[in-house]
């Protein structure tokens, strides 16, 4: 049996000067290879969970493991931990630290202690993979929000983490930028990286994730296959609303939907409707 990639065991955390903990006895297991959407209402603790997983915050109680290794807040152990878990913040300004795109991506590589030739090689590869070659010498303050997010993500992925955590990656992105993000995440996932996004964007989660986790009152109340969760969505999280495509699918006659998987993309939905209308035409 394989060792889980990430484990939380009864983890608790409370911010200073606040009466109630954000996370309380929070437990879950994450297997490698997943595309996970972490869902929850505002203030449910999604970002806090990420900061704890990335060892930016120290838990008050409980244990956290990555690939079977316990999180210990000692300099050398933290260095190794943070090489395995990469975190991209909701606001890219929080992690862009250099003047230009190339310098920012190189910053983390230099901190790893790589030699100049190794840094140059990894930088060149990352610029190509993230379509940033033309922007390599561009000052960061000249970039759009979408470009800054791409640079921040490139800086994280240049370090080759095993697990990638993305905090609200679709915020303020238009439809085209969201599609570009989806394609980029698919590419990263195909290279072997496990990805978890914390998001309020149900439509993005619905079309992208293969695993759903729902955070309620400081605990992971649901951790299951996306097909199962969305197939019985009102049972799990009615307070979060309903993904648009799922809502449209549920409005169709039950006979249309019987024994058919619900569509996860607009293309799949259109194909299902087209096929059904063709059958109706044949019957007429």
From Swiss-Prot:
Please tell me where ATP binds in this chain.
40-47
- Which keywords does the record carry? ATP-binding, Cell inner membrane, Cell membrane, Membrane, Nucleotide-binding, Translocase, Transport
Q: Which GO terms describe its molecular function?
A: ATP binding; ATP hydrolysis activity; ATPase-coupled transmembrane transporter activity
Q: Which residues form the ABC transporter domain?
A: 6-242
Q: How does it sit in the membrane?
A: Peripheral membrane protein
E.C. number(s) listed in UniProt: 7.-.-.-
Per the entry, what this protein does is: Probably part of an ABC transporter complex. Responsible for energy coupling to the transport system.
Q: Which family is this protein grouped under? A: Belongs to the ABC transporter superfamily.
Q: What is this protein called?
A: Putative ABC transporter ATP-binding protein tll2439
Q: What organism does this protein naturally occur in? A: Thermosynechococcus vestitus (strain NIES-2133 / IAM M-273 / BP-1)
């Amino acid at each position: 049996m394989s060792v889980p990639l990430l484990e939380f065991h009864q983890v608790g955390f409370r911010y200073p000067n606040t009466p109630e903990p954000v996370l309380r006895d929070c437990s879950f297991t994450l297997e490698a290879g997943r595309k996970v959407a972490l869902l929850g209402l505002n203030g449910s603790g999604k970002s806090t969970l990420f900061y704890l997983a990335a060892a930016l915050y120290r838990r008050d109680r409980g244990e956290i493991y990555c690939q079977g290794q316990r999180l210990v807040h000692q300099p050398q152990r933290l260095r190794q931990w943070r090489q395995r878990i990469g975190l991209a913040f909701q606001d890219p300004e929080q992690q862009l630290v250099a003047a230009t795109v190339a310098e920012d991506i190189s910053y983390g590589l230099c901190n790893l202690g790589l030699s100049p030739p190794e840094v140059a090689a990894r930088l060149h590869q990352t610029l190509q993979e993230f379509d940033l070659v033309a922007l390599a010498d561009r000052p960061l303050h000249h970039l759009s929000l979408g470009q800054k997010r791409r640079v921040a993500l490139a800086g994280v992925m240049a370090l080759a983490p095993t697990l990638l955590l993305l905090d609200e990656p679709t915020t303020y992105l238009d439809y085209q930028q969201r599609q570009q993000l989806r394609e980029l995440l698919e590419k990263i996932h195909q290279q072997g990286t496990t990805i978890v996004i914390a998001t309020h964007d149900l439509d993005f989660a619905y079309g992208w994730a293969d695993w759903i986790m729902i955070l309620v009152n400081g605990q992971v109340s649901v951790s299951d296959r996306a097909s199962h969760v969305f197939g019985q969505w009102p049972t799990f999280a009615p307070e979060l609303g309903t993904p648009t495509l799922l809502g449209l699918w549920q409005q169709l006659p039950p006979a249309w939907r019987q024994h058919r998987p619900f569509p996860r993309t607009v293309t799949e939905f259109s194909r299902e409707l087209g096929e059904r209308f063709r059958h109706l035409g044949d019957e007429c």
